[in-house]
A protein has these predicted regions:
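Phosphate-bearing ligand-interacting subdomains
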Residues: 1-41, 45
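Structural signal for interior beta-strand "rungs" in well-ordered beta-sheet cores
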Residues: 38-142
Length: 142
Protein backbone atom coordinates (compact mmCIF):
# COMPACT_ATOMS: atom_id res chain seq x y z
CA UNK A 1 0.00 0.00 0.00
CA UNK A 2 3.00 2.29 0.50
CA UNK A 3 6.52 2.57 -0.83
CA UNK A 4 8.32 -0.77 -0.50
CA UNK A 5 11.54 0.65 0.98
CA UNK A 6 9.81 2.44 3.86
CA UNK A 7 9.79 0.30 7.00
CA UNK A 8 8.74 2.78 9.68
CA UNK A 9 5.55 4.79 10.13
CA UNK A 10 4.19 7.22 12.71
CA UNK A 11 0.57 7.79 13.59
CA UNK A 12 -0.28 11.41 14.37
CA UNK A 13 -4.01 11.14 15.02
CA UNK A 14 -5.30 12.60 18.29
CA UNK A 15 -8.30 11.55 20.33
CA UNK A 16 -11.15 13.18 22.14
CA UNK A 17 -14.25 11.12 21.48
CA UNK A 18 -12.66 7.86 20.31
CA UNK A 19 -9.26 6.33 19.56
CA UNK A 20 -10.83 4.27 16.75
CA UNK A 21 -9.12 6.06 13.80
CA UNK A 22 -5.73 5.71 15.51
CA UNK A 23 -6.35 2.05 16.35
CA UNK A 24 -7.56 1.18 12.83
CA UNK A 25 -4.56 2.95 11.27
CA UNK A 26 -2.25 1.05 13.63
CA UNK A 27 -3.75 -2.31 12.59
CA UNK A 28 -3.46 -1.48 8.88
CA UNK A 29 0.16 -0.37 9.22
CA UNK A 30 1.10 -3.48 11.22
CA UNK A 31 -0.65 -5.74 8.69
CA UNK A 32 1.39 -4.05 5.94
CA UNK A 33 4.61 -4.85 7.84
CA UNK A 34 5.48 -1.43 9.24
CA UNK A 35 7.37 -0.80 12.47
CA UNK A 36 5.99 1.99 14.63
CA UNK A 37 8.78 3.64 16.61
CA UNK A 38 8.24 5.40 19.91
CA UNK A 39 8.88 9.16 19.91
CA UNK A 40 10.14 11.18 22.87
CA UNK A 41 10.45 14.97 22.73
CA UNK A 42 13.93 16.21 23.64
CA UNK A 43 12.51 18.03 26.65
CA UNK A 44 10.68 14.95 28.00
CA UNK A 45 12.14 12.90 30.84
CA UNK A 46 11.52 9.15 30.58
CA UNK A 47 13.00 6.89 33.27
CA UNK A 48 15.31 4.15 32.02
CA UNK A 49 13.09 1.75 34.02
CA UNK A 50 9.90 2.75 32.19
CA UNK A 51 8.53 0.42 29.49
CA UNK A 52 7.04 2.25 26.52
CA UNK A 53 5.39 0.20 23.75
CA UNK A 54 5.52 0.89 20.02
CA UNK A 55 3.87 3.86 18.39
CA UNK A 56 3.59 5.89 21.59
CA UNK A 57 4.40 9.60 21.47
CA UNK A 58 5.65 11.46 24.56
CA UNK A 59 5.57 15.22 24.01
CA UNK A 60 7.41 18.26 25.39
CA UNK A 61 8.15 18.63 29.10
CA UNK A 62 6.52 15.33 30.09
CA UNK A 63 7.86 13.25 32.96
CA UNK A 64 7.50 9.45 32.94
CA UNK A 65 8.91 7.98 36.15
CA UNK A 66 10.27 4.56 37.04
CA UNK A 67 8.49 1.26 36.56
CA UNK A 68 5.77 2.89 34.49
CA UNK A 69 4.27 0.91 31.59
CA UNK A 70 2.69 2.67 28.62
CA UNK A 71 0.97 0.56 25.95
CA UNK A 72 0.81 0.79 22.17
CA UNK A 73 -0.03 4.01 20.32
CA UNK A 74 -0.61 6.23 23.32
CA UNK A 75 -0.27 10.00 23.37
CA UNK A 76 1.26 11.57 26.46
CA UNK A 77 0.67 15.24 25.78
CA UNK A 78 2.68 18.32 26.76
CA UNK A 79 3.71 18.82 30.42
CA UNK A 80 2.01 15.70 31.79
CA UNK A 81 3.52 13.87 34.76
CA UNK A 82 3.20 10.09 34.94
CA UNK A 83 4.49 8.94 38.31
CA UNK A 84 6.06 5.63 39.40
CA UNK A 85 4.42 2.24 38.81
CA UNK A 86 1.62 3.60 36.60
CA UNK A 87 0.16 1.31 33.92
CA UNK A 88 -1.39 3.09 30.92
CA UNK A 89 -2.95 0.57 28.54
CA UNK A 90 -2.91 0.83 24.73
CA UNK A 91 -4.56 3.59 22.65
CA UNK A 92 -4.93 6.09 25.50
CA UNK A 93 -4.64 9.86 25.21
CA UNK A 94 -3.32 11.68 28.25
CA UNK A 95 -3.95 15.37 27.53
CA UNK A 96 -1.86 18.41 28.47
CA UNK A 97 -0.72 19.02 32.05
CA UNK A 98 -2.25 15.84 33.50
CA UNK A 99 -0.82 14.40 36.72
CA UNK A 100 -1.23 10.65 37.25
CA UNK A 101 0.10 9.73 40.68
CA UNK A 102 1.81 6.47 41.60
CA UNK A 103 0.39 2.99 41.01
CA UNK A 104 -2.61 4.09 38.90
CA UNK A 105 -3.97 1.96 36.05
CA UNK A 106 -5.59 3.61 33.04
CA UNK A 107 -7.76 1.22 31.00
CA UNK A 108 -7.33 0.74 27.27
CA UNK A 109 -8.71 3.45 24.90
CA UNK A 110 -9.19 5.98 27.70
CA UNK A 111 -8.99 9.77 27.50
CA UNK A 112 -7.82 11.97 30.39
CA UNK A 113 -8.58 15.67 29.86
CA UNK A 114 -6.18 18.59 30.30
CA UNK A 115 -5.21 19.57 33.82
CA UNK A 116 -6.72 16.49 35.48
CA UNK A 117 -5.16 14.93 38.58
CA UNK A 118 -5.53 11.28 39.58
CA UNK A 119 -4.85 10.31 43.20
CA UNK A 120 -2.47 7.40 43.78
CA UNK A 121 -3.69 3.83 43.06
CA UNK A 122 -6.72 4.91 40.98
CA UNK A 123 -7.99 2.31 38.49
CA UNK A 124 -9.91 3.46 35.42
CA UNK A 125 -11.88 1.01 33.29
CA UNK A 126 -11.38 0.68 29.53
CA UNK A 127 -12.79 3.56 27.46
CA UNK A 128 -12.94 5.94 30.43
CA UNK A 129 -13.48 9.61 29.57
CA UNK A 130 -12.19 12.08 32.15
CA UNK A 131 -13.18 15.73 31.58
CA UNK A 132 -10.58 18.47 31.76
CA UNK A 133 -9.49 19.70 35.19
CA UNK A 134 -11.04 16.69 36.93
CA UNK A 135 -9.83 15.60 40.34
CA UNK A 136 -10.14 11.80 40.44
CA UNK A 137 -10.20 10.42 43.99
CA UNK A 138 -12.08 7.15 43.41
CA UNK A 139 -11.60 4.30 40.93
CA UNK A 140 -14.39 3.53 38.46
CA UNK A 141 -13.50 -0.18 38.45
CA UNK A 142 -13.05 -2.61 41.32
Amino acid sequence: IFFTKIKHAAICIGQIKTPKPREETYKKLKAAGFNLPTFFAKSAYVSKNAKIDEGTIILNKCVVNSNTKIGKCCIINTSSVIEHDVNIKSFCHISTSVTINGSCTIGEKSFVGSGSVLRESIRLKNKSFIKMKSSIKKSNIK
